[in-house]
Structure formats: C-alpha cells, structure tokens
C-alpha cells in the first residue's frame, strides 16, 4: 500500500512539473502567439487506469503556470481524433488548438467576463453536413436542416458551456460540428465529441476566462 501511494505521489508530481512543457511545440501555432490563457485537455494513464484532465494555465511574465488545480473531464465516447481526422458523427473529440470566444447557458447571465449567449427553446446547432447552416447556431424558424441539436436540453448538459471554435472558420462540410466544453452527465460518462466536466468546474473555468487574454483550448497535445 505504501509503495502504491508513493507511485501515485510521484506520478502526480511529474504531471505538475511537466504540464506546461507540453505547450512548447505549440508556441508558434496560429492562435497561440497572443494567448494568455490555455485550457490543456489531456489523457493520463497510470497502471490500468486512464483518466482525462483539464489544466487551466495562464501566462505570467512569459511563463506558463497552473492557474487552478487540474479538473476531471470526459471526452468523446470513441476517444480523441488525431488532428485533421475528426468527422461528423464519429463520437471522437478533435485534437488540436482552438480558440474560445463565446460562453453560453440557460440563465439570462453567467458569472463570466466572456461574451455570453443565453440559449432559448428555439436555439439549434445544425449538424446536417448538407445544410448551408452546418455547424452554426440558428433559430428553429430560420432553418430547414434535416438534423440539428437543441441547445436548451432537458438534461442540463448545456446549462453552462463555452463554444470550442472547431471547424467554425471556415466551416468544412462533414468535419464535425457542435464541439463545446460543457457540463458532464457524470464522471463515468462520455460525450458525442465534446469535452465535459462537472458544473462546479465549468463555472470555475467561466469565471477565470478573460477575453482580453485570448483564451484557447489545447486538446490532446501529445498527438503528433
């Protein structure tokens, strides 16, 4: 038992001391040059266990430092998609670096500095690759899309969240849609391709994010 505890402690220390180093290969990536905040989403394996974590990192005096303790997270039911391989409906979370611009939720306002959009009953996110509004937020009376996702759900998974700017500019048909950071269904749940965490942690993230610091999310940074 003591040996196991020591190994767990060592693993935790290693994660703390190397997490910022994982940003180094992305230092010149588009979107990273002006970023002052990063959400680093990783998978971590120890013995026979694999978990996913979100590390909130902030740049201080040109150095990346952890802004908060790492948070438990869940991802797509089929894991991460390597860069460029995400496809509509594949159940995978896209790997890569993406901007964070707009928060959303059910209440009229949220405790965040980010631009915020209240989601109403008729708000839809189009996931029909053949529709001209693919991967766009639109009102129900403005679309004839064959497939879409209601943004005000009965299960409260979108009670609070933030849009991950994946495949949004430009939008490419079939490469995936509706990728968000949102509230999870539980620690043992999965998503259709989003990143999710507890409501408490999502609120912490929303309260921390600062649009003046050009926040981004880096998903699965160890994927070449």
Predicted regions and their residues:
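Sec-dependent signal peptide recognition
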Residues: 1-4
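Cell wall/extracellular polymer interaction/catalysis modules
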Residues: 16-191, 202-224
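Conserved "landmark" site that anchors the functional core of diverse proteins
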Residues: 198
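C-terminal motif of bacterial Sec signal peptides marking the signal peptidase cleavage site
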Residues: 11-12
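Short cysteine clusters
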Residues: 194
